[in-house]
Amino acid sequence: MASSSSILELNETEKELSDIFLNVSKKIGQMDRKEPEVRFAGGWVRDKLLRIESHDIDVAIDCMSGFEFAQHLQSYLAQQHPDWETKVIKIDANPLKSKHLETATARIMGMDIDIVNLRHHDYTNSNSSNKLVFGTPLEDALRRDATINALFYNLKSKTVEDFTGKGLVDLSNKIIRTPLVADETFGDDPLRAVRCIRFATKYDFNIHEETIKGLKNPELHERLRSSISRERIGVEVDKMLKHCNTNRALKIIHSLGMFACIFGPLEIHTKKLQSKNIESLSLIPYAIDLFGYLQKKDVSIKNLSSSSKYIFWLAIATLPWYNWSILEKSKIKILPPILIRDSLKYSKPIMSQVENFFVHYPLIMSKINVLEKEGKLTRLGCGRLVRELGPHWRDIIDWAFFMNTLISNSDIQRLNKDEEVTWFHVLVKHIEEYGMEEAYNIQPIINGNEITRILGIRPGPHLRKMLDDSIEWRIQNPESTKEDYIAIMLEKGTSAVVDS
């Protein structure tokens, strides 16, 4: 029997939405049909009980599909609020990707609304036939990912319903637990395993020991790797990186043996791998601790923007495959950025930033070696470096410092005494003192047409070299003018005008 001991305080928007749904339900009942019982479900109820405002509401209907109810809702709003121009979108079930419920979505009064029917106890199989089978609130609650997400708010009775009998207690005790045996819950949809970790690290809850056993199941890991769309996994990881304790999330994933099935190579990569060194999964706990420490202690890394931290965490997540390479379009490439693209389905700009971290690490270390030997870099050297690294040059240098510390196995407690720390800071200071922070934006001081006209030469590959030389001359001579460059160019002709 459901517990209904908690009363929720709805804001004005939620009250109006509740009234709208109840009115639609009544209108359906007046059409010689069973009046649907409408419940707000899942995350919205959880967050209201935690006193967290939510702009997403899942709506559960007991006697018809979510899309059918949404069509009645759309008709009602077209009559009562034509200016809202409410549109309903139907998202079909996709059992092959463990999405078993048809969903209707709409945006109403600034709220994102998902409408579904109550899950049947065998809903993963019942939708394979043409006949839609409706469940009871208890059946639906038991088929959800966690007890704290299996709570309902009954719009008619205005009470919270806890059909599992554990949701309110687990919410109070800060426990993440599956409503059924974990293997069964994760069997319905393996992505729930990732969601459980996300909820634990978002709300600082502990995962129940029985749920942990299910999370360690190798069969679950294989299903996550092979049967869940990588876009869905990418969405969950994105939420972990943006809204959770990422440090703890990655540690939990590692401790459960789930790192490879979430971040690692897929079957599509197997035949194209060129070098496959031992996965450095043992590095992960130290890498996580190190980055956490540097965010507190290092003068540069503690000032990373949220977007830069996001890229850092993705690079750390793919670190175990740093020394792996893959053949793509006749080119040998390092594996981590490929994993960002394929295993998480993230955008090309994100993939490129992770790639720059790894690809430019040797270049940064070569500059550090020069600094250690000579104590300084030239103005041109700093300008060339920033142009090579691009607008995220600071992050790439910070990553190189992080990687160098990680690889050298420095004791975290001794980092402030490490000589390498000062040299990475010196490199940044050199760039700043030379005013090269935006060297990647420097354009040629003269264009190609002007060069061909002034020197009386034809266009060709040599022109690109001369334009590049004009940029480097500009880096070396920031106070000089275009006329100064033309004079030198006339004196030297097509030969170089840059002092290497």
Swiss-Prot record:
InterPro entries: NT_sf (IPR043519), PolA_pol_head_dom (IPR002646). Residues 122-139 are annotated as: Flexible loop. GO terms for cellular component: cytosol; mitochondrion. GO terms for molecular function: CC tRNA cytidylyltransferase activity; CTP binding; tRNA binding. A motif (ERhxxExxxhh motif) lies at residues 231-241. Its EC number is 2.7.7.-. It holds the Pfam family PolyA_pol. Keywords: Nucleotidyltransferase, RNA-binding, Transferase, tRNA-binding. Disulfide bonds: none annotated. It is an enzyme of class 2 (transferase). Cca1 contains two alpha-helices (His-81 to Thr-86 and Glu-479 to Asp-484) and a beta-sheet (His-120 to Lys-131) that are not seen in cca2, suggesting that cca1 has lost A-adding activity because this beta-sheet reduces the flexibility of the loop (Asp-122 to Glu-139) as compared to CCA- and A-adding enzymes. PANTHER family: CCA TRNA NUCLEOTIDYLTRANSFERASE, MITOCHONDRIAL (PTHR13734:SF5), TRNA-NUCLEOTIDYLTRANSFERASE (PTHR13734). tRNA nucleotidyltransferase involved in the synthesis of the tRNA CCA terminus. In contrast to what is usually observed in eukaryotes for which one enzyme synthesizes the whole tRNA CCA terminus, in S.pombe, cca1 specifically adds two cytidine residues to a tRNA substrate lacking this sequence while cca2 specifically adds the terminal adenosine residue thereby completing the CCA sequence. Belongs to the tRNA nucleotidyltransferase/poly(A) polymerase family. This is tRNA nucleotidyltransferase cca1. It comes from Schizosaccharomyces pombe (strain 972 / ATCC 24843) (Fission yeast). The lineage of its organism: Eukaryota, Fungi, Dikarya, Ascomycota, Taphrinomycotina. The gene is cca1.
